[in-house]
């Protein structure tokens, strides 16, 4: 018995045990995972935005944290309201037109470029059945959009109250250091700091990259006189949240619409545009926004996306890579550059 107690008192075993307990608790609350993830995402992004805005405004005059947070959430509420009344009808109409166009292409596959060559290699492809199945999946998600919308509103409210009372919350949580739950507090604080640093950093980078991809794609499609600009831009933004694979996936519908709009030359143009945007993402945005320890080989990226989508569904495509990077950070799996920088950084701090 003493040996068993000594075994669980080992720091590594204790940390792993608490991690398993935390994972089990999250599994018990899996029905609320949307609210939990949305609250964390909104809190993290708004906290970073508040810091940037306050640093900029402080160059001219002093402003409190609460004033900036209040302004940001009021601005967000105004944007959501205006977007709902002004842009929603336009976007909804364009998405309906986009759906009709995809249906037309599905039931007339001869309009797809190189369709004869594809069928000669892979055999007959019943595209209409795939499209029907895809629309059934989309309809299932749209049927729950009211529930998801309520979760978004609740997550925004929770994130606002969290940011308002961030100092009081940290002071309250610090009381657990001297409580009987000190061991749990120390390990949870360790995982929390790692989670915010890696998971939050990667998510923030994904949102910025998706926004830049969306803007660049919108400009390119506008120059090429594409139809349904807003609908396609929203599609590109959400696909851009999927690391690496999102850019490739967006190429398929864009190429089909490009062919129906301007023929083979437009397909070539859109391929060049997507490759140019992917090059900007790979060689400029990723090195600027992500640290060395978050860079993954393409094979690992796609493997993680496949498994995370299987276990977590649509959320897995967005949070799969951040969770994987978080686990790597816990295990201290870093690049040689990071390890060589670590001692120097620590010595500088001392």
Curated annotation (Swiss-Prot):
It is found in: Cell membrane. It holds the Pfam family AI-2E_transport. One of its GO terms (cellular component) is plasma membrane. One of its GO terms (biological process) is transmembrane transport. The chain crosses the membrane at residues 18-38, 67-87, 145-165, 207-227, 229-249, 257-277, 289-309, 311-331. Its main location: membrane. InterPro entries: AI-2E-like (IPR002549). It is a multi-pass membrane protein. Keywords: Cell membrane, Membrane, Transmembrane, Transmembrane helix, Transport. Belongs to the autoinducer-2 exporter (AI-2E) (TC 2.A.86) family. PANTHER family: TRANSMEMBRANE PROTEIN, TRANSPORT PROTEIN YDBI-RELATED. This is Putative transport protein YdbI. It comes from Bacillus subtilis (strain 168). The gene is ydbI.
């Amino acid at each position: 018995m003493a040996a068993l107690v000594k075994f669980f008192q080992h720091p590594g075993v204790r940390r792993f045990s608490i991690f398993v307990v935390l994972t089990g608790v999250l599994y018990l609350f899996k029905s609320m995972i949307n609210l939990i993830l949305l609250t964390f995402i909104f809190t993290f992004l708004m906290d970073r935005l508040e810091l940037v805005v306050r640093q900029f405004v402080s160059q001219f005059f002093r402003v409190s944290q609460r004033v900036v947070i209040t302004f940001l959430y009021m601005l967000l509420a105004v944007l959501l309201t205006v977007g709902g009344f002004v842009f929603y009808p336009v976007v909804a109409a364009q998405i309906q037109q986009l759906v009709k166009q995809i249906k037309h292409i599905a039931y007339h596959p001869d309009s797809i470029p190189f369709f004869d060559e594809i069928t000669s290699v892979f055999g007959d492809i019943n595209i209409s059945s795939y499209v029907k199945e895809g629309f059934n999946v989309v309809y299932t998600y749209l049927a729950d959009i009211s529930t998801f919308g309520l979760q978004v509103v609740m997550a925004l409210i929770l994130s606002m109250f969290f940011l308002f009372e961030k100092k009081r919350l940290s002071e309250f949580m610090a009381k657990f250091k001297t409580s009987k739950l000190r061991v749990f507090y120390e390990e949870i604080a360790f995982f929390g700091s790692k989670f915010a640093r890696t998971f939050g950093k990667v998510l923030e980078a994904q949102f910025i990259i998706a926004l830049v991809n969306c803007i660049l794609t919108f400009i390119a499609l506008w120059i090429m006189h594409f139809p349904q600009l807003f609908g396609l831009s929203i599609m590109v933004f959400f696909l851009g949240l999927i690391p690496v694979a999102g850019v490739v996936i967006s190429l398929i519908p864009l190429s089909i619409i490009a062919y129906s709009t301007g023929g083979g030359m437009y397909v070539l143009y859109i391929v060049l545009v997507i490759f140019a945007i992917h090059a900007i993402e790979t060689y400029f945005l990723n090195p600027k926004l992500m640290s060395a320890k978050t860079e993954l080989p393409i094979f690992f990226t796609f493997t993680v996306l496949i498994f995370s989508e299987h276990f977590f569904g649509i959320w897995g495509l967005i949070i799969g890579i951040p969770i994987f990077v978080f686990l790597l950070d816990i295990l201290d799996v870093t690049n040689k550059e990071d390890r060589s920088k670590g001692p120097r950084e620590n010595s500088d701090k001392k």
